């Protein structure tokens, strides 16, 4: 007879929600994770009194009231609004693309002026059916927005020229003709006060948890540990890369503690020119409106993936 009803591989958000719901229904769960901590990619670590998002910025947002009420069982959320900034050759632009962006780029004031400029640029390009991502983006937003805010950033993310990327990667690029810097359109939005790790800790309180545990080694030694397995890792790895590895990318994070109370004045700044090696800088204290004397920043570098490093 198995010791557990469920072996859950991965202590991230999906695995932890499953474990919580299962234990609430009287099931016995063992949750394992190959990392040395729980919470997966939403893991936050307190550094200098600042909750640092160790795997990139995570802003919770939803329009579903039931989901919002559910996560608020495990943590209080603040009213943070995601309003990233793009830096291109020392000029700053608001994201997502909106009237603040267009006003800075072209010195205009009205939606009609912005629409006319974009439409004119698209017409001059005379692109038929887009053959690649570059043509797709140009046909959607015109030359200036593409060259300044999309091209370099996208090439850094994917590690190849936009002309070598398929058009289907970008289905649409939202253009807002209002002065609204809110990145999301959802009804509810915020950051867990005190970090996200506490949410996962509470969800896993009724389960057995083992970190630093590789599933493939563990299951060899414990083949009958559970009646059922919930696997939240890489599906290609689960099947032994039988058909080869999927086309992942990876991200390298370079964290730095700085002796200043405010480095960039915003939580997220994207660097969209190709010459800057990183894709963005996150200043974590701004997620919770921190007043600490020091600050922690993370530079993100996109990288080729290979087995043994984190896939994204």
Task: Give, region by region, the residue ranges found by the protein language model.
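N-terminal Rossmann-like FAD-binding beta1-loop-alpha1 element of flavoenzymes
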Residues: 4-31
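Mid-domain catalytic core of redox enzymes
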Residues: 25, 216-312
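Conserved beta-strand segments of alpha/beta enzyme cores
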Residues: 28, 51, 76, 208-210
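A short alpha-helix-loop-beta-strand transition element characteristic
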Residues: 67-89, 145-148
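N-terminal glycine-rich dinucleotide-binding loop that anchors FAD/FMN and/or NAD(P) in oxidoreductases
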Residues: 45-70
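Active-site/ligand-binding neighborhood in enzyme catalytic cores
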Residues: 86-93, 99-228, 232, 236-239
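Short His-Asn-centered micro-motif
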Residues: 9-11, 32-34, 62-63, 194, ...
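Glycine-rich FAD pyrophosphate-binding loop
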Residues: 23-48
């Amino acid at each position: 007879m198995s010791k557990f009803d469920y072996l859950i591989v991965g202590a991230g958000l999906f695995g932890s929600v499953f474990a919580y719901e299962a234990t609430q229904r009287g099931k016995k769960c063992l949750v394992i994770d190959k990392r040395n901590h729980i919470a997966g990619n939403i893991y936050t670590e307190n550094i200098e009194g600042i909750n640092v998002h160790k795997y990139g910025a995570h802003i919770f947002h939803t329009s579903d009231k039931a989901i919002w009420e559910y996560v608020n069982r495990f943590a209080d959320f603040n009213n943070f609004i995601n309003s990233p900034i793009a830096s291109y050759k020392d000029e700053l632009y608001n994201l997502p693309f909106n009237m603040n962006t267009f006003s800075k780029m072209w010195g205009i004031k009205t939606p009609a002026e912005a629409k006319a400029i974009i439409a004119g640029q698209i017409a001059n390009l005379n692109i038929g059916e887009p053959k690649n991502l570059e043509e797709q983006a140009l046909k959607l937003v015109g030359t200036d927005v593409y060259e300044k805010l999309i091209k370099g950033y996208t090439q850094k993310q994917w590690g190849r020229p936009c002309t070598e990327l398929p058009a289907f990667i970008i289905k649409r690029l939202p253009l807002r003709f209002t002065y609204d810097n809110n990145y999301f359109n959802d009804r509810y939005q915020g950051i867990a006060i005190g970090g996200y790790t506490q949410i996962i800790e509470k969800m896993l309180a009724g389960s057995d948890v083992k970190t630093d545990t590789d599933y493939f080694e563990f299951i060899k030694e414990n083949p009958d540990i559970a009646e059922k397995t919930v696997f939240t890792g890489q599906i290609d790895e689960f099947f032994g890369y039988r058909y080869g590895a999927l086309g992942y990318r990876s991200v390298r994070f370079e964290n730095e503690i700085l002796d200043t109370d405010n480095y960039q004045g915003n939580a997220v700044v994207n660097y969209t020119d190709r010459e800057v090696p990183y894709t963005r800088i996150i200043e974590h204290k701004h997620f919770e409106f921190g007043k600490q004397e020091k600050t922690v920043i993370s530079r993100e570098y996109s990288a080729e993936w290979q087995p043994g490093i984190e896939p994204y």
